[in-house]
């Protein structure tokens, strides 16, 4: 199951832009996100933001909405956040109706690709699966996943 929400002001206070530069911020307002639950991330939500312009393929690009005809709109996996506190979840949000309908139809596909995006990162960083350096950079160089190693169960050996 999923919900469409905004992230709360408390989230942005606890994850300030100067320390978490890859997390999306919009002056004075929050991003709309889809809350996904993923089996191996118990007690957490994976919040994937809707973007008007997504110039890469690390996510799901809408194909059938009016907005997607003018923009590269999509759900951006590279800017996801993982939250374990309910206080980080803000109010419900409404999104473009065409994108909502397309999301509903594609939800299983999006969910599977999101799980793979996270899984491949964790496996690479933990040393269980090695992605080519160029492939890793293309997928994860600007990713927010580096901020959520604790939630992902990643222990970086020093």
Which residue stretches match the model-derived regions?
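A broad, low-specificity signal marking well-ordered, structured residues that form hydrophobic/aromatic
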Residues: 2-5, 45, 75-81
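Residues that form or immediately flank small-molecule/cofactor binding pockets and catalytic motifs
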Residues: 9-10, 52, 85
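Surface-exposed beta-strand edges and their flanking turn/coil or helix-capping segments
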Residues: 17-20, 58-63, 89-97
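Compact nucleic-acid interaction/catalytic patches
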Residues: 26-28, 38-73
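C-terminal terminal-subdomain/extension
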Residues: 66-158
């Amino acid at each position: 199951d999923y919900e469409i929400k905004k992230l709360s002001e408390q989230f942005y206070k606890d994850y300030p832009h100067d320390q978490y530069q890859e997390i999306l911020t919009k002056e004075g307002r929050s991003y709309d996100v889809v809350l996904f639950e993923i089996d191996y991330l118990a007690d957490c939500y994976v919040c994937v933001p809707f973007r008007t312009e997504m110039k890469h393929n690390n996510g799901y690009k809408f194909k059938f909405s009016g907005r997607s005809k003018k923009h590269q709109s999509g759900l951006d996996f590279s800017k996801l956040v993982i939250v374990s506190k309910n206080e980080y979840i803000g109010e419900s949000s409404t999104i473009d109706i065409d994108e909502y309908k397309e999301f509903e139809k594609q939800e299983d596909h999006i969910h599977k690709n999101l799980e793979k995006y996270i899984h491949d990162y964790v496996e690479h960083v933990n040393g269980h699966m090695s992605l080519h350096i160029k492939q890793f950079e293309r997928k994860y160089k600007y990713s927010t996943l580096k901020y959520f190693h604790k939630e992902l169960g990643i222990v970086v050996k020093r």
